[in-house]
Structure formats: C-alpha cells, structure tokens
Amino acid sequence: MKTIGMIVAVELQSVLKRYGAKLVKRKETAGYQVLEYETDQYRMVIVNCGPGEIAAASGTQFLISEYHVDIVMNFGVVGGLTEEMSKTKVCIVEKVVHYDFDTSAADHTEVGRYSQYPDIFLPTTKVLSDTARKIHPELVPVVCASGDKFIADPEQKIRVHEMFSADICEMEAAGIVLTC
C-alpha cells in the first residue's frame, strides 16, 4: 500500500472534508499534529506544520524520515495573481518559483534561481500532475510563486506575476519541493 504524505499549513478541517477517509490514528509527535487515514488504495499521513517555507520543509522531512512516504502533497489556500486565478477553485502546480530567494548580489544569478537547477523554476513531479489532470480534468495547471511573505497588495501581486509568470502565490511550496 502506498503512503501519501500531506503537508497542511493551516486549515486541517478542509482536508478532512475533501478526502474523508477513515481516521486510523491522531497524535501529537515531534511538535506536529499528525493524522493517519486509510482507504483501500492508500495510507495518508497528514502533518499540520503551520505556515511558511521553513515549517513546510521541516514537516516534509518529518514525513519522509518518520513515515517513509512515497509522495508528498501540499494542500492549502493560495492567492491568485491573475483575475482568472482569483476565481479558480482548484489547481495543480507544475512549477514553483521561490520569488523571495535572492543571491544575485553575491553570484549575479537571477532572483529565484538555485544553482543546481537550470532556471528559476523548481519542477514538480510531472507524472503526478499528468495523472491528477487525467483523473480531475478541472485542475488548472499553474506556476506557483512561493515565499515567506503573505502577498495582499494588488500591485505586488502584479509585480510577482509579471516578473515570474506565476499564476498563484503561497508560502510553502518552495520548501516542500526543495526538501523532496
């Protein structure tokens, strides 16, 4: 049976409503609220890590080390950077850009670029996003701008969208992708 790890920053009740599997175990461990569910097809371990990239990276490593998860999913609320995405209910992230990662003063690389990647975009697992879109065609593929800053200012949303071609923004994805 596959084990799915899920990182949730805030709204744990939304996950429970969406996935509605049978709760097997609920516990507090290593500073995390951990919920374990099972269906006939998979086991799901949900960690409520709190908001932010460092919290998400830590929660992701916890899932990998302690539960040996096969995949990690990020479930949460995002902000739309375009009018269309402000109205969209569900999406699937195909690429992530860490918009507030900036070493350009030291190494002259572009903002968001990690040297081990060919460009500013951190890839997600293509086979997973393709499979998810086959099962749920309503999922809109997006580029996610991730950073440790809640973006509420409309002008800043426009800047992030224009600078990185991002459709949504949130605070956990870069930490999760870099950890996996």
Report the location of each language-model feature.
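Proline-aspartate-enriched helix->loop->beta-strand connector
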Residues: 68-73, 166, 180
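Short glycine-rich, acidic/polar surface loops and turns
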Residues: 170-180
